[in-house]
From Swiss-Prot:
Its EC number is 2.5.1.-. One of its GO terms (biological process) is polyprenol biosynthetic process. It is an enzyme of class 2 (transferase). This is Isoprenyl transferase. It comes from Parasynechococcus marenigrum (strain WH8102). Binds 2 magnesium ions per subunit. Mg(2+) binds at residues 35, 222. Belongs to the UPP synthase family. Homodimer. Substrate binds at residues 36-40, 48, 52, 80-82, 84, 86, 203, 209-211. PROSITE patterns: UPP_SYNTHASE. Gene3D superfamilies: Decaprenyl diphosphate synthase-like. It holds the Pfam family Prenyltransf.
Length: 260
């Protein structure tokens, strides 16, 4: 990346955060559905692949902003289990793009203390990409900066089925009593185990759906939808999303504290 991701040692996130935002009321964990790459390219008379390239730059910028502004975790929906149904040349391009970006950016991620994890059924990915993912995960595991989760070959329903199978296997082996299965034990079997659930979901391109993304984890997340295509998502768009988040009263199923 051309600029540092994480906050420098002599500058605090509160100093970098836009003054319109309350630095004490930022979401801890932001999730993004990066939609609109193809339409962004088509609107400019470009191949869809160019939209994906531009989308990578938007993701790099968003990661940098989240780190600088004091957001602890960013989870991005990069490639869903349904995306395999796209044209083969587009899928192949995306796999190659993932490989090239990892090879190019890993050193910077290490230097800036970003901890990166890839969430999903990774065994179905090309072998070279699997190796790069394993290397990146291992080399950044001890980093204490922003947590960057990249959902790759990920599907929320498949994740829940996988978790249920793992719990069933434990019960069948006598390691877990069925009546002891609770929310915590199921959450521990999800790809996101150990990560706080997202406080805010941002979806670009104006689509109002969650597309099989983090079905369990988004139970109490605030949702912000913007008409901006993902390649055009920038600091102003992120600030608007965070202002929207800070305008909400999060009740988690209860009453507003101000309600008599």
């Amino acid at each position: 990346m051309s600029r540092p991701l994480a906050t420098s040692h002599d500058t605090t996130p509160s100093q970098l955060c836009p003054p319109e935002l309350d630095g004490d009321r930022l979401p801890v964990h932001v999730a993004v559905i990066m939609d609109g790459n193809g339409r962004w390219a088509e609107a400019r008379g470009l191949p869809r692949m160019m939209g994906h390239r531009a989308g990578v730059e938007a993701l790099k910028s968003t990661l940098r902003l989240c780190s600088d502004w004091g957001i602890a975790a960013l989870t991005a929906y990069a490639f869903s289990t349904e995306n395999w149904s796209r044209p083969g040349d587009e899928v192949n391009f995306l796999m190659t793009l993932f490989e090239r970006v990892l090879q190019k950016e890993l050193r910077t991620l290490e230097e800036e203390q970003v901890r990166i994890r890839f969430l999903g059924d990774l065994d179905a990915l090309p072998l070279k990409l699997q190796e790069l993912i394993g290397d990146a995960t291992e080399r950044t595991a001890a980093n204490d900066g922003i947590h960057f989760n990249v959902c790759t070959n990920y599907g929320g329903r498949r994740e829940l089925v996988r978790a249920a199978q793992r719990l069933a296997r434990q019960a069948a082996n006598g390691d877990l009593m069925p009546e002891d299965i609770d929310e915590n034990s199921l959450a521990a079997e999800l790809f996101t185990a150990g990560e706080q659930d997202p406080d805010l979901l941002i979806r670009t391109s104006g689509e109002h759906r969650i597309s099989n993304f983090l079905l369990w984890q988004l139970a109490y997340a605030e949702i912000h939808v913007t008409d901006v295509f993902w390649p055009d998502f920038n600091a102003e768009a992120l600030k608007r999303a965070l202002l929207d988040f800070q305008s909400r009263s999060r009740r988690f199923g209860g009453l507003d504290p101000l309600t008599p």
